[in-house]
Each structure stands twice: as structure tokens, then as C-alpha cells.
Amino acid sequence: MFLAQEIIRKKRNGLALSSEEIQFFVQGITTNSVSEGQIAALGMAVYFNDMNMDERIALTTAMRDSGTVLNWQSLGLNGPVIDKHSTGGVGDVISLMLGPMAAACGGYVPMISGRGLGHTGGTLDKFDAIQGYQTEPSSELFRKVVKEVGVAIIGQTGDLVPADKRFYSIRDNTATVESISLITASILSKKLACNLDALAMDVKVGSGAFMPTYEASEELARSIAAVANGAGTKTTALLTDMNQVLASCAGNAVEVKEAIDFLTGAYRNPRLYEVTMGLCAEMLLLGGLASNEADARAKLNRVLDNGRAAELFGKMVSGLGGPVDFVENYSKYLPQSQIIRPVFADMQGYAYSMDTRELGLAVVTLGGGRRKPGDALDYSVGLTQVCALGDKVDSSTPIAVIHAQSEAAFAEAELAVKKAIHIGETAPEKTPEIYAYIRASDL
């Protein structure tokens, strides 16, 4: 029998906690036998004194086991259960293509996603733009779609990782969100509760990223890769660029449209293609569905070119309550803004740098994102045709097209977009889409 205050004291004094102490405390978070004040105190003690890798693994697995852990064995799946998670960014629509692409190559992708908050968009919000799509289906329907289609993208259910829900809300109110140890446990407990065989982790770097510096992003990526592999899930973390909007757009309905265009081959943004392929190829390799990266990329290009990935996206949408002809007729179902108008830079030149976070906040200002949890969204608004760094812009080439519901909202977003995209006389040096892969062998 342990005492919560003694566990807090031990961590406050900079000592390592045993896995039994961590399990006891997490159980107390779940059963409410540990108070909010005690949870806040432990969070602050961890923030200042950190946790070693054994402690991080113990915290992650204890939080994973605080609720239901999904079991796929009874479904008799004939392929690996694989997934991807992103730390979030602007125009990060990867999940919508990656899930069906991986499923078309023989994987099963039970993706549990979140809603957007602050400047980052949420995968679930994009699906909420699709009429009828159930982001919170019954567990029976979720399992049925995973088995029959190979991919289902839904929201977190109440019985998954309840400890994280309580711990996170207290961290949010007590300034301990930024702890790498606690971020690692929060992200991975939710993913590992899905009982995955393999995970590709997308850790963003740059002006639109969650972590403020490259060094902090790399530290988080290493922590996630080490803890996930230590907990028994094959995981690779990729460090990817978020110094500009990833897709050509940012919003909800506009990103769904770009995902369909990507899957059908109507338009594939080259940067988006590179990061999607990098993550998806890693999932196939970790899941044993490809022998090397070239093999993985060839398989992925095949399911894009032959239409199989687009077909599975359509089946997932209809399987979860959306229209059966969504891929073919998406424009009939997606909401559209009242005002769709380009914005031009005040000078001609090249898109030199971008404050990606500010562009994400411009979408929030339009009504396409949340200032606080629970805010209602307008799924039609956002930005399209966002220029890429290095693009030449002038009086006839816009830096973006704004989708707004009123002249006032358009004017506010126009100012924000012009301020966020910096124009230079020369093009900037090209930066890679993927900075690094952190595999188990690198740890």
C-alpha cells in the first residue's frame, strides 16, 4: 500500500518512482482516490525533475491499462494492425489518405483521432464536415468497419484511457503541459490502447509545430520512439517540416476535398505526397507488409494509381454513415462558404517564410477552429491555394484564397494571411520535408 503524498514527495526530491508506485497513482487518478491537488503536484514534480525511460514506460502502460484495451484477435484479421499519429500542424490532412493507402496494402488501421485546438486542425473535425459520418460509432460498428474495409477513423471513446483525460485537463490548468515525459505518456497511452503491432509517429518541426524548437521536437520524437518500443510496439518517429502549411489548404471541408483529389490523382501537392509516403512506407515496413522502402513506395503508388485507396476511403465513409457516393460527388455534400476570394501580397517577389501558427489562427478567426474546447465550428471556411515557400507571387498570383462567411471575417483573415506570409526578393533555400527517421536501431 502506497500513499499518494509519499509518491509526490519522492518525485519532488528528484528520485525515480517504481512501476508499482506509478501504477498505484494512475489507478488513483482513474478512481478519483487521488485529489486534483495531488495530481497537479505530481505533474509539477515531473515537470521539474523529469522521469527516466523506465518511469516513462511505466506511466504510459499504466495509463493505457486504465481503461479498455482493444482486442483484435477475435476478429481474425489477416494482416498487421498499424497506425500513425501526428503532433499536429496546419494543413496536416495526411491521415485521410494514409489510412486507406495502408489498408489497401494489407494493413488494418483503427485510427483514433482528436479534434483541433488552438492553431492546429483536428482530423475528426474534417470528418464532421462529411454529412452523416459518425465520428463516435458503437465499438461494434468500429470493429466491423476495421475488419471489412481495413480502416476506420473515429474519435476517442469514454472507456479508452480515462486516466489521461483527467490528468491532461489538470495539466492544462496548472502549466505542466510542456513536460516531454508527460506528453509522451499522454500520446502513447491512447495509441497503445488500440493494441497496435506498429506505429509511425509524425513529430512536427517549425513555426506551426507544437514544440518550439528543432531540439525539443527531436527530444520528443526520441522519447516516443524509445517508450513505444520499450512497451512492445514497433515504432519509428519521423521529424517532418511544419515551417509552412503542409497541404495547399487549411480548414475542414477544404482539406477533405484535397484528400479526395490526392487519392483520385486529380492533384497531389508534392510536399504532402512526400510526407504521406514517408510515414505510410514506414508503417508497411514495421508491419512486415514490404521488404524495403522502395518496395513499400511501389506498393503505395500502385494502390493510388489503381484507385484502390480511393475506393477504401469511400467504403469507410459509407460504412460509418456517410454518403455512398461521397468520393465521386463530394462537392454535392461538402459545405461551401459565402465568400471565396483571393488575397494578394503587397509586393511582388517570392514567398520567403511563413508563420504557420498564425495561418492556423487565421482559420480559427474565420470560424474553422476552436479557441476553447466545445466551440462550434463552421466546416466550410478556411484557406486554399496557399503558396509554397519559394513560389513567385505578384499582382495576378495570390498568396492564398480565403473562404469566409462575411466581409468582416474575410477582411480580418486577409490581414492575418498577409502578415503571416513574408515576401522576399529572392527564393529561400529549399528545406527537406522529412528531416530524420528515429528507428528502434537508432536509440
From Swiss-Prot:
One of its GO terms (molecular function) is thymidine phosphorylase activity. SUPFAM superfamilies: Nucleoside phosphorylase/phosphoribosyltransferase catalytic domain, Nucleoside phosphorylase/phosphoribosyltransferase N-terminal domain, Pyrimidine nucleoside phosphorylase C-terminal domain. It catalyses: thymidine + phosphate = 2-deoxy-alpha-D-ribose 1-phosphate + thymine. Keywords: Glycosyltransferase, Transferase. It is an enzyme of class 2 (transferase). Pathway: Pyrimidine metabolism; dTMP biosynthesis via salvage pathway; dTMP from thymine: step 1/2. Disulfide bonds: none annotated. GO terms for biological process: pyrimidine nucleobase metabolic process; thymidine metabolic process. The keyword Transcription regulation does not apply. Its EC number is 2.4.2.4. It holds the Pfam family Glycos_trans_3N. GO terms for cellular component: cytosol. The keyword Transferase applies. It comes from the Bacteria. NCBIfam families: PRK05820.1, T_phosphoryl, Y_phosphoryl. The enzymes which catalyze the reversible phosphorolysis of pyrimidine nucleosides are involved in the degradation of these compounds and in their utilization as carbon and energy sources, or in the rescue of pyrimidine bases for nucleotide synthesis. Homodimer. Belongs to the thymidine/pyrimidine-nucleoside phosphorylase family. This is Thymidine phosphorylase. It comes from Shewanella baltica (strain OS185).
